[in-house]
Amino acid sequence: MQGPGGNVSRGLPGGPASTVASGAGRCESGALMHSFGIFLQGLLGVVAFSTLMLKRFREPKHERRPWRIWFLDTSKQAIGMLFIHFANVYLADLTEEDPCSLYLINFLLDATVGMLLIYVGVRAVGVLVEWQQWESLRFGEYGDPLQCGAWVGQCALYIVIMIFEKSVVFIVLLILQWKKVALLNPIENPDLKLAIVMLIVPFFVNAFMFWVVDNFLMRKGKTKAKLEERGANQDSRNGSKVRYRRAASHEESESEILISADDEMEESDAEEDLRRPVKKKHRFGLPV
């Protein structure tokens, strides 16, 4: 005759004991959104996003973006990455074998094939914007003063690019039948699996992606040069030509003095006025 302790030791079918045993060493469906998984995701977001702050301080001082411009640039990328992250979490639950492995495969595809697609998308959008002369939709330019509508429009364009990228990656995932791949099966600790999938691998890959994509979205030096060239052309059309000359004094021998065309005309008129009396004296034979 068995006591209550015997029943507990064996466990009832489908009871808590058997559930824990069957789930030991497995990354089960929904594990990515458990409390430990959410904690790792938040920690990853803070650490990875801090690389963008490091990137800003490493920019040359004459090209360093003001904090407001930097925030507008990086916030677009943060929104896009959040979309990709939650899309990967949703797609990871499509498999019953190992969601952690599927999330990791999705993430690595985003970091390789996805990076190329993002680059192509940003370049294609840039060509379209230049062709249509949509000034407010140029990535990294928000007007002077800053316009919230420009940021909203650029953010919407970037989300469209991310939707395109994620759709292509999902198609590749289906074609290659990678839903059945279980990369992390040799690892028995489910918390270690989550740490690898949500923190360790994504930290290095996300830092690289944030750094590179920020270069895609920020205002380029070529764009600045084009704007300056346009301003110079507009000034020349208005007739305000400018040239440089060397200073005549010894103390300022290495300095350059900017002289406008109007100043030159005033100097030439003054010299002409001084020469007129001399010419008249020569004409009448008077001593100069």
Curated annotation (Swiss-Prot):
Pfam families: STIMATE
Classification via PANTHER family: STORE-OPERATED CALCIUM ENTRY REGULATOR STIMATE, VACUOLAR MEMBRANE PROTEIN YPL162C
Biological role stated in the UniProt entry: Acts as a regulator of store-operated Ca(2+) entry (SOCE) at junctional sites that connect the endoplasmic reticulum (ER) and plasma membrane (PM), called ER-plasma membrane (ER-PM) junction or cortical ER. SOCE is a Ca(2+) influx following depletion of intracellular Ca(2+) stores. Acts by interacting with STIM1, promoting STIM1 conformational switch. Involved in STIM1 relocalization to ER-PM junctions. Contributes to the maintenance and reorganization of store-dependent ER-PM junctions.
Gene Ontology biological-process annotations: activation of store-operated calcium channel activity; store-operated calcium entry
Segments on the Cytoplasmic side according to the record's topology features: 1-28, 215-288
Membrane association type: Multi-pass membrane protein
Alphabetic keyword roster: Endoplasmic reticulum, Membrane, Transmembrane, Transmembrane helix
Family label: Belongs to the STIMATE family.
GO molecular function, one term: calcium channel regulator activity
Acidic residues bias locations: 261-272
Region of interest (Disordered), ranges: 228-288
Sequence ranges of Basic residues compositional bias: 277-288
Motif mapping: GXXXG motif: 149-153
Any one annotated GO CC term: endoplasmic reticulum-plasma membrane contact site
Alphabetical list of InterPro entries matching this protein: STIMATE/YPL162C
Membrane-spanning parts: 29-49, 69-89, 102-122, 156-176, 194-214
Subcellular localization(s) per the UniProt record: Endoplasmic reticulum membrane
Domain characteristics, as noted in the entry: The GXXXG motif may mediate oligomerization. The C-terminus is necessary for its localization at ER-plasma membrane (ER-PM) junctions as well as for the store-dependent rearrangement of ER-PM junctions.
Gene that encodes the chain: Stimate
Region Required for localization in the endoplasmic reticulum, annotated ranges: 241-246
Oligomeric and partner information: Homooligomer. Interacts with STIM1.
Top-level taxonomic group: Eukaryota
Major place of residence: endoplasmic reticulum
Record-given protein name: Store-operated calcium entry regulator STIMATE
